Amino acid sequence: MAGYISGDTRKVTTHRLVEMKQRGEKISMLTSYDYTTAQIVDGAGIDVILVGDSASNVMAGNVTTLPITLDQMIYHGKSVVRGVKRALVVVDLPFGTYQTSEYEAVTNAIKVMKITHADALKLEGGVEIIDAVKKIIAAGIPIMGHLGLMPQSINKYGTYTVRAKDEEEAEKLLSDAHLLEETGCFALVLEKIPASLAERVARELTIPVIGIGAGGAVDGQVLVVSDMLGMTNGFSPRFLRRYADLHTVMTGAIQQYVDDVKKGDFPNEDEQY
């Protein structure tokens, strides 16, 4: 088992991720949005923590990722960074903060990095945002790309179904992947695309390719932490594996607490001053 458990407390860097790909070591990645969860995830040995704009769904209850603001992402980013010693921390730039102009993209990227002290940022898109990616990287900020299903573009596509199933879209994705690498991205997330296409991308690129619903032949995997811990009900995509049933555990614990309070069993004599 990796991480603190095995005594490997060296800080994960973008360079180390490339080295992991080169030696065939899979990269583990999970989301976190708060200090306490980040401490646990980091201490368990995760390689990369993504402060995802999925906080819009998980933390705020929104239907999409679109409503979350830059300041809200900064708040979550700061909270996570404080809890992390080893993992590489990547923060999503939210919708509307890098699409309008290169100047605004760089300004917002610098703001996030200066305030959160994160290690890198993630942006969704290919050729459409490549000028913004170039400028941000030129400012010295590491960028992780994101292709395939892009939640920030949900209103464009209208569905969360598998992307790049037809030849035209697959070829564009492949072209965008190469373009992002050539522009200087240190890694790439592929979301919900055919496993065969993801395998080809991972094989052709020298940078790490991390998948979510993209098969097992990529260089690493990412999941939303509350999903894989079984905290959410009613969400069961094909790619999700639940490693715990915390929804049941937490519900039972809270019900027991309520019962103890109602009966006067809490606090007992040992729990008083």
Swiss-Prot record:
User: Any idea which positions bind 3-methyl-2-oxobutanoate?
Assistant: 53-54, 92, 122
User: What cofactor(s) does the depicted protein rely on?
Assistant: Mg(2+)
The places in or outside the cell where this protein is found are: Cytoplasm
* Classification of source organism: Bacteria, Pseudomonadati, Bacteroidota, Bacteroidia, Bacteroidales
The note describing how and how many cofactors are bound reads: Binds 1 Mg(2+) ion per subunit.
- Give any Pfam family that matches: Pantoate_transf
Which pathway does the UniProt entry assign to this protein? Answer: Cofactor biosynthesis; (R)-pantothenate biosynthesis; (R)-pantoate from 3-methyl-2-oxobutanoate: step 1/2
The first-level EC class reads transferase
> Member of which family?
Belongs to the PanB family.
Reaction equation(s) it catalyzes: 3-methyl-2-oxobutanoate + (6R)-5,10-methylene-5,6,7,8-tetrahydrofolate + H2O = 2-dehydropantoate + (6S)-5,6,7,8-tetrahydrofolate
Quaternary context:
Homodecamer; pentamer of dimers.
Per UniProt, Mg(2+) binds at 53, 92, 124
Report the source organism. Answer: Phocaeicola vulgatus (strain ATCC 8482 / DSM 1447 / JCM 5826 / CCUG 4940 / NBRC 14291 / NCTC 11154)
SUPFAM superfamilies according to UniProt = Phosphoenolpyruvate/pyruvate domain
Q: Name one GO biological process term.
A: pantothenate biosynthetic process
Catalytic residues at 191
Entry GO terms, CC: cytoplasm
**Origin superkingdom:** Bacteria
| Protein name per its UniProtKB record | 3-methyl-2-oxobutanoate hydroxymethyltransferase
Functionally, this protein is described as follows: Catalyzes the reversible reaction in which hydroxymethyl group from 5,10-methylenetetrahydrofolate is transferred onto alpha-ketoisovalerate to form ketopantoate.
As recorded in UniProt, its EC number(s) are 2.1.2.11
Entry keywords, A to Z: Cytoplasm, Magnesium, Metal-binding, Pantothenate biosynthesis, Transferase
**Molecular-function GO terms, alphabetical:** 3-methyl-2-oxobutanoate hydroxymethyltransferase activity; magnesium ion binding
Listed InterPro entries: Pantoate_hydroxy_MeTrfase, Pyrv/PenolPyrv_kinase-like_dom, Pyrv_kinase-like_dom_sf
